[in-house]
Amino acid sequence: SAGAVTLAQAQAFFAEQQAQGAAGVMIKAIGGGGGRGMRAVMNADELPEAHARCMSEAKAAFGVEGVYVGRLMRNARHIEIQVPGDGQAVASLGERECTLQRRFQKLVEIAPSPSLPDALRTSITQAALRMARAAGYRSLGTFEFLVDAESATLPFVFIEANPRLQVEHTVSEAGTGLDLVEQQRAGAAGAPDDSGSATPASSTGSGQ
């Protein structure tokens, strides 16, 4: 959905996705993450309770009760692209894979992803860069996607962008040799971004 939804709107979205063969929908809080205000719904009868619970959890955790809905991708992998920008240009510092999670909390981060085909890696990276350019992005941030490499019609979807460094930025630092904290400090002081010259480590996977 494009924004916060009412129960009626969530139900309409569920019916639309079901007609397209989706397994269900994911309800997610607008105000924050960490698994709070977030539920997968695969049965239309469960939607009213799930919608109400997510709104209640979101209000308690973030002070904002709004939730949105998206297509449920049951076997998706979680891929995030590290993007620096200086307001004029943007670059990619490669991806991290954080599919291994418990209760929607990331347990392991791998950079680069050993499971991502090269063509799909390129498509996802370009999608992240297009969004960053469109926003005139100036910061270090993470553009996150769900990926279903076996799908011929919907191989990946955008989840969210976090316009800040996250704790997992050190994984990207290890792969590029860059000090991203210093990079962000320099950017805040007005220095142009030069991280695009860094080359992320190549994947140990086949990439096929």
Please describe what each predicted stretch is.
Residues 1-30, 35-37:
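A conserved helix-loop-beta module that forms one wall/lid of the active-site cleft
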Residues 24, 34, 41-208:
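ATP-dependent carboxylate activation and anion-phosphoryl transfer catalytic cores
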